[in-house]
Amino acid sequence: MISKEKKQEIINAYGRNANDTGSPEVQIALLTERIAELTEHLKINKKDHHSRRGLLKMVGQRKGLLEYLKKTNLEGYRELIARLGLRK
């Protein structure tokens, strides 16, 4: 679970303003953070298949948002994956 402070930091870093929670850049950054936390959880709890299913759902959601961003704003897409350290 992402704390309020961490979530606000991500929104400030990737959003267009402090209240921008809906832009694809912010959504992708938040999903990336949640995926990283859940990945760490699953390294410890290998048999937690319910969380694994949620992780796969989040990865798919992020993939769809990345495809949308690539289609609508190619330069923003390239910048975002470089900042987040995603491979594409």
Curated annotation (Swiss-Prot):
Keyword set, alphabetical order: Ribonucleoprotein, Ribosomal protein, RNA-binding, rRNA-binding
GO BP term, pick one: translation
Molecular function GO terms recorded: rRNA binding; structural constituent of ribosome
Superkingdom of source: Bacteria
Record-level GO cellular component terms: cytosolic small ribosomal subunit
InterPro entries named among the record's database cross-references: Ribosomal_uS15, Ribosomal_uS15_bac-type, uS15_NS1_RNA-bd_sf
SUPFAM superfamilies linked: S15/NS1 RNA-binding domain
Record PANTHER family: RIBOSOMAL PROTEIN S15, BACTERIAL AND ORGANELLAR, SMALL RIBOSOMAL SUBUNIT PROTEIN US15M
Protein task: One of the primary rRNA binding proteins, it binds directly to 16S rRNA where it helps nucleate assembly of the platform of the 30S subunit by binding and bridging several RNA helices of the 16S rRNA. Forms an intersubunit bridge (bridge B4) with the 23S rRNA of the 50S subunit in the ribosome.
Family, per entry: Belongs to the universal ribosomal protein uS15 family.
NCBIfam families: S15_bact
Subunit text: Part of the 30S ribosomal subunit. Forms a bridge to the 50S subunit in the 70S ribosome, contacting the 23S rRNA.
Protein name in UniProt: Small ribosomal subunit protein uS15
Species, as recorded: Lachnoclostridium phytofermentans (strain ATCC 700394 / DSM 18823 / ISDg)
